[in-house]
Every structure is written in C-alpha cells, then in structure tokens.
Design a protein with these regions (language model features):
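Phosphate-end processing signature that detects enzymes handling 5′-triphosphorylated RNA
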Residues: 1-232
C-alpha cells in the first residue's frame, strides 16, 4: 500500500485563458518556437476531479464574485480506468494572483463504477484522524478533461492545455452521476504557472504565447447553465 502523507505546495502564480479548439495548433507552434525551450515532461493524460462545496455554495459564490481569498476542495485521480484507483484530496487556496494547495496524497481510493457516494469514495488511512477539510461539504460536480504538459528547459515555467472537458452535475444526495454529462468542447484552457519568486517570467511568456489572461473556473463552468459561446 502506498503511504499516506500531507504536504503544502509553495505559492505560485497561475494565469489562464480560454480559446477555441481551432486555435490549438497556433498555441502549440508558439510553445515550440519559444526561446524558453519547452518540452513535454509527461505524456497527456485524463484528469478527473470531484468538487465539493457547502450547502450555500460558498466556493462557487467566492469564485464568481472574485473574492480575495478563495478555497476549493476536490478529490483528484488520473486516467480512464473503471476500477478502484488512488486519489488525492486537494484543498486549493487562491489569494489575488497567488495560489497554493494542501495535498493529502493517497488518502483516498475512488471507484468510478460505484452508484452511491458511500461506494465511490473510500478513506484508506485514518492516521490523521477525521479530515475536517470535508466537514459540511457535499460533492457538487465531477469534471474530466485531457491535459497536455509543457515545461521550460530550466523548469521555471509550466504550461498546460486542457481540452475535451465534460462535467457531471451531482444533485442527488446519495447517488453518483457519471452518465449524464455536459460537454464543454467549444473551448480549451491554457494555463501558465510560475513560482512566486519568478513572477518576472510571466511577462516574457505573454510576449511569446498569444493569450490574454482572464479569470476562469472549471467548477463554475460546470454548474452555470451552458451558453452557446464560441471563441472564434
């Protein structure tokens, strides 16, 4: 069994943009030609996340309003397998342009075939005691997408491109929904990530990669009624 452990990431800057799938080749070309010499540190993979929120949807409201300090809670796992798989609880905080995470790695297993929440999420290790981060929290949405990874030659700049986004609204208290989905195929998300100490690199990336940073939340997008917006 893999050991369970908790860690807090360093603060970093994350900037995002949404763009049309038809522009993918333009971004890939700009990344390839960048003087930062990007390479692919990992193969593309599917990311799956269960997003939690309280009864009043405070996390959703904070994100929409752009409140200074925002918190999102999610259990994340990777791949398309339908059997039980190790998962990580992420408590992500964002304040202004800075974000950081509290990670509880290997604390949970997720069973994508489960029909109930009792069977979907299994706690593997109680060494930390009850996890207060999920008290009064309910599963609100499951989001899946494919992610490409790029990293500068010196490891200081990371870029991800997310596509084929789909979300599954969780509005029945005890039953999971992994059948009825909402497709978000009319856009992709590009995200640039740098450590807070390397903030000066953000402007260099913006000069080379053709995007305009904006606030964007996959969780919000999954809950807000879908509109026919095409980023051509």
């Amino acid at each position: 069994m893999k050991p369970t452990y908790s860690t807090t990431t360093e603060k970093r800057i994350e900037i995002k943009d949404a763009f049309s799938p038809y522009e993918l080749s333009k971004f890939e070309s700009a990344i390839k030609l960048s003087r930062l010499s990007f390479y692919c540190p990992y193969p593309s993979r599917q990311i799956n996340s269960i997003y939690f929120d309280d009864y009043s949807y405070r996390s959703l409201e904070d994100s929409i309003e752009g409140n200074s300090l925002r918190t999102k809670r999610r259990i994340r796992w990777y791949g398309m397998q339908k059997k039980k798989v190790d998962a990580t609880l992420e408590v992500k905080k964002k304040q202004g342009i800075y974000s950081w995470k509290q990670l509880y790695k290997n604390k949970y297993k997720v069973n994508p075939n489960a029909k109930s929440w009792g069977g979907m999420i299994e706690s593997k290790d109680e060494k930390y005691g009850p996890n207060t981060d999920l008290l009064n929290q309910l599963p609100r949405s499951i989001i899946s997408y494919n992610r490409q990874y790029f990293c500068s030659f010196d490891g200081k700049v990371r870029i991800t491109i997310d596509q084929n986004l789909q979300s599954f609204l969780q509005n029945i208290p005890f039953s999971t929904n992994l059948i009825r989905s909402k497709k978000h195929h009319n856009f992709m998300i590009i995200e640039v990530k740098v450590d807070s100490k390397d903030e000066h690199l953000v402007e260099l990336v913006r000069q080379e990669i053709p995007f305009a940073p904006r606030r964007f939340s996959k969780y919000c997008e999954s809950l807000i009624p879908q509109k026919d917006i095409y980023l051509f």
